[in-house]
Amino acid sequence: VTFDVVSGERRYIGGVIAPGLEAMTDFLYQRTALLPRLSLKEPHRAVGKSTVEAMQSGAIFGYRGLIREILARIKAEQFSRKKVAVVATGGYARLVASRMPGVAVIHPHLTLEGLRIVGNLN
């Protein structure tokens, strides 16, 4: 997952790179003897009643925690008293960001649409 930070003047400030949600769950599957490959979906509760439920809980709730912490630090360091628009994009944007306060827009295909627009300019 990447976090790209853009100023109010539309200037790229920098970014953050962290492991993606699928990379996290694939790592568990590939590096442990008995944990299954996950189908990612919203957990019903934090404490799972099965291995799959426990893994889904750890993946989704843990990932939201990672995102919240990084966003909080970006806001504190770069935009201490300014309003910030957070846009979630990518394949798991809806699953992860739909239950996160502070996310202004969820647009899973924004990058592809941007590439289409740039392609049409040429």
Predicted regions and their residues:
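Gly/Thr-rich phosphate-binding beta-strand-loop-beta motif of the actin/hexokinase/Hsp70
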Residues: V1-Y12, L28, L115
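ATP-binding/phosphotransfer module of carbohydrate and carboxylate kinases, centering on a glycine-rich
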Residues: M24-N122
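A mobile, often basic/glycine-rich helix-loop segment
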Residues: G14-A18
